[in-house]
Amino acid sequence: MANTLEQFKSITTIVADTGDIEAIKRYQPEDATTNPSLILKAAQIPDYAHLIENAIEWAKTQSSQIDQQVEDAGDKLAVNIGVEILKIVPGRISTEVDARLSFDKAGSIAKAHKLIKLYQEAGIDKSRILIKLASTWEGICAAKELEQEGINCNLTLLFSFAQARACAEAGVYLISPFVGRILDWYKKDTGLEYSATEDPGVVSVTEIYNYYKRHGFNTVVMGASFRNTGEIIELAGCDRLTIGPALLEEMANSQTEVVRKLIPAETTVEAGEPLTEAQFRWEFNENPMAVEKLAEGIRNFAIDQGKLEVMLKEKLTS
């Protein structure tokens, strides 16, 4: 019998949730995703020193202002790591817009254009890039405009049905509904333990998947943020799942039989009118878990972006 990972690959597209090139080589995923926290982690890997140096030297040619150099070096480093990953994966890389732009539609669009330009200058077509944006109202509106320009987006930090519905209605290419972070919140809030089938994160992604398929939305559902392989097994059949190296390793060393759990609807019905901004904000606000986890996720990504910039600034001024 094939191992659990190989069985899973025949049902669901596996995406590596890491910036570690060696891990990506080991598990041979279709795509890869990065975020500010993963870029910060990758920047500590000695084999990546040349990518950092290249970003530093490039940034120095772009501006004489240190703050602009730091910003440019951060963007260039994220792209440099993405370019290396694209030498291995046959599909796409997701590169994230600065979390501090999560409530700035125009700023998010401008940053997306800059990242795409950097990839194109490195010989990478935009068809291999997904621009990651937080699933705020502003992020979703930015993604809608980018999609209309032919720039595909990955809407992340997605914790609620309201966010998922708004993304589909905006014509977003892909969403990353978080599983493990939803579980974390409910375990802390209730003090209970949950089986994989009852896991609130699994239930949330299943609801989103079924809604999309029932109403004929083309937006790809890519479950993210897993705490254990049980969550992953329960989402077999989801369009894609992005999984970290530790859980990929566990799946590769397991013989657990994989049975498809998510199955698309055979017939579709038309969805209702799109959510207005007021409706979105109200529905989202009614979900305390989603409100807390989105805010926390944005803050934490911004903190790690700041840590990366401190490191880059030291190198730029040394």
Curated annotation (Swiss-Prot):
Question: Where in the cell is the protein located?
Answer: Cytoplasm
Q: GO molecular function of the protein, one example?
A: transaldolase activity
Q: Which major enzyme category is it?
A: transferase
Its catalytic activity? D-sedoheptulose 7-phosphate + D-glyceraldehyde 3-phosphate = D-erythrose 4-phosphate + beta-D-fructose 6-phosphate
The biological pathway it contributes to is: Carbohydrate degradation; pentose phosphate pathway; D-glyceraldehyde 3-phosphate and beta-D-fructose 6-phosphate from D-ribose 5-phosphate and D-xylulose 5-phosphate (non-oxidative stage): step 2/3
Alphabetized InterPro entries for the sequence: Aldolase_TIM (IPR013785), TAL/FSA (IPR001585), Transaldolase_1 (IPR004730), Transaldolase_AS (IPR018225)
Q: Which UniProt keywords apply?
A: Cytoplasm, Pentose shunt, Schiff base, Transferase
Query: E.C. number, please?
Result: 2.2.1.2
Q: Which GO terms describe its biological process?
A: carbohydrate metabolic process; pentose-phosphate shunt
What residues make up the catalytic site?
132
Q: Name one Pfam family in it.
A: TAL_FSA
Taken from the UniProt entry, a GO cellular component term is: cytosol
Gene3D superfamilies, sorted: Aldolase class I
UniProt lists the family membership as follows: Belongs to the transaldolase family. Type 1 subfamily.
Q: What NCBIfam families does UniProt report for this protein, alphabetically?
A: PRK12346.1 (NF009001), talAB (TIGR00874)
Outline the subunit composition: Homodimer.
The job of this chain, per UniProt, is described as:
Transaldolase is important for the balance of metabolites in the pentose-phosphate pathway.
Protein name stated in the entry: Transaldolase
Q: Upper taxonomic classification of the species? A: Bacteria, Pseudomonadati, Pseudomonadota, Gammaproteobacteria, Alteromonadales
